[in-house]
Amino acid sequence: AQQDAIAYIIAEIPTNPRVEVPDLEALKKVLSMSRKTSSGEKAIEPVFILDQTFCPNLHFLSDGATLSSVKAIAYASGSKFPSGGLCTAGYCIANKKGDVFTSKIALHLELCDNEATDLQYEILAKQLPSMNQRIKDAYKNTREFVNFIEKVLPQAKINFVSQVLASQGFTPSVFSLDLPTKGNTAQEKETYKRALNHKLIKAMITQIPDQSKYCVSYGQLKGCYWTIPATSTQGTTKEGDKDYIARVSVSPQINLALHKKVFLDFVQSI
């Protein structure tokens, strides 16, 4: 604001890997505040850029929605729920206040030859109609799996949306799992936990090889994906800041009973 420049604010809702959702009303209030330049003139409004890959079913920017009154653009990774993992093309939309940017984005895609291919359009057109139902079914499976883990391993810390947030439409099918550890020093505890993480994932991918995969993606059509560190973006994160917890992505089609059995066997082995 002081420089009379445009502030581009980028946020991921829910966050990855800890599946956090901010107070949207508070966010709206901050984004809507009137600010002044160094000369006392009214500053340019900020632009809010939302990554809603983990909840592509939510209408954050529709008329009357919380963020409809601020300049906003939302995007989702097409490689996740929109295509069920069948293509990599994503998409973005803007609300009425942010629509001025749509033509600029389209021009950028054209100049960079970065538009989706005909095949990608075809895949998205085929998969998008079933997306909301797939999200609903996957969330149901995830909630059941999370409840089971909380029951058989209450010492574990699970990052997942609350029932209250779920009732508001935040129904992701991914959670992060911080396994209990032991040791006399922080280093011993971290080493033990990392070994335990790999023991769990090895059990899952070897005992359920047709469904459990060591993969960082999300929104897949079937099976269960496990990964450590909990997000692919941590490949560029310095080692000391990496989050060595397991991220688990559950699908609408999964043998949940078998996954529960393998997890229970794992718990009993530690």
State where each predicted segment sits:
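Conserved beta-strand positions
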Residues: 11, 50, 177, 248-250
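Conserved small-domain helix->loop->beta segment predominantly found in fold-type I
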Residues: 123-135, 143-243
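Short, acidic Gly/Pro/Ser/Thr-rich loop/turn segments
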Residues: 100, 182-185, 255
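Short beta-strand-to-loop capping motifs
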Residues: 94, 177-181, 250-252
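Conserved PLP-enzyme active-site core in the AAT-like
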Residues: 1-150
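Structural alpha-beta junctions
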Residues: 32-44, 68-71, 150-157, 202-216, ...
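Generic structural signal for residues positioned in beta-strands
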Residues: 74, 174-176, 247
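PLP-dependent enzyme catalytic core of the Aspartate aminotransferase-like
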Residues: 1-7, 21-42, 222-270
